[in-house]
Amino acid sequence: MSAEKSDKAKISAQIKHVPKDAQVIMSILKELNVQEYEPRVVNQLLEFTFRYVTCILDDAKVYANHARKKTIDLDDVRLATEVTLDKSFTGPLERHVLAKVADVRNSMPLPPIKPHCGLRLPPDRYCLTGVNYKLRATNQPKKMTKSAVEGRPLKTVVKPVSSANGPKRPHSVVAKQQVVTIPKPVIKFTTTTTTKTVGSSGGSGGGGGQEVKSESTGAGGDLKMEVDSDAAAVGSIAGASGSGAGSASGGGGGGGSSGVGVAVKREREEEEFEFVTN
């Protein structure tokens, strides 16, 4: 009996040194028939209750300020408690509410299944059969950065073209030439001839005769220079040649021959001048 009295005295002494909030937690655990628990459980429950009550009071203060109240009212605390319960302590809906939602959902018919469809699989992004890798080439081309390309001079190498039948010949690069055609001037020579008839008196027994002479005026004729606009140089020479002057002989009078002008056209080839442009 003395031992039991001493244990009760120790327990009562320990309870006196425990804070009032901790005593409330211990009494709640005792009512729930929780006999064995660690001492730190009480401290954890105290922290939880302190945080919960603080949040409730802060929300109640916000509601009171919104209603322009100077102090927190019981209605503000109840509203804050309901909002916190709906937000923190969520639970399933009531049975009759779930039944109504299920009836509405089941009234909607499912989409028909197409006959040509095979295995019903979700989209590719949700399947594990999709390819999520890429093959890497064994011989990857080397990539040069922009700075390396700018610092290195560029060289152009021309490979000779080899044919299967003929020998290999080096490939030469020929600069492109531009041909400029200059129209050639046309030179025309014009000569004029004059025919003169001179009368001569014969002897006493003979009759009189006439002498025909052909003369060309001008030492070299008239020179005319023209430029052909069609780049085709055609030279035309108009000349007149007189046949030799005949002398009159015999008694009845002599006849003379006159010169006939013949037009000669000669076509000259077109000359081309080549200018090499870089």
From Swiss-Prot:
InterPro entries: Histone-fold (IPR009072), TFIID-31 (IPR003162), TFIID_subunit_9 (IPR051431)
Annotated compartments: Nucleus
Main location (coarse class): nucleus
Disulfide bonds: none
Pfam families: TFIID-31kDa (PF02291)
Biased segments, Gly residues type: 200-210, 241-259
GO-annotated cellular components: nucleus; SAGA complex; transcription factor TFIID complex
GO biological-process terms attached to the record: follicle cell of egg chamber development; RNA polymerase II preinitiation complex assembly; transcription by RNA polymerase II; transcription initiation at RNA polymerase II promoter
GO MF terms held by the record: protein heterodimerization activity; transcription coactivator activity; transcription coactivator binding
Keyword line: Nucleus, Transcription, Transcription regulation
Compositionally biased residues, Acidic residues: 269-278
Biased composition annotated in UniProt, kind: Low complexity: 231-240
The protein's assembly and partners: Belongs to the TFIID complex which is composed of TATA binding protein (Tbp) and a number of TBP-associated factors (TAFs). Taf9 and Taf6 exist as a heterotetramer. Interacts with e(y)2.
Biological function: TFIID is a multimeric protein complex that plays a central role in mediating promoter responses to various activators and repressors.
Domain notes per entry: The C-terminus is important for mediating interaction with e(y)2.
The protein, known as: Transcription initiation factor TFIID subunit 9
Source organism phylogeny: Eukaryota, Metazoa, Ecdysozoa, Arthropoda, Hexapoda
Gene name for this UniProt entry: Taf9
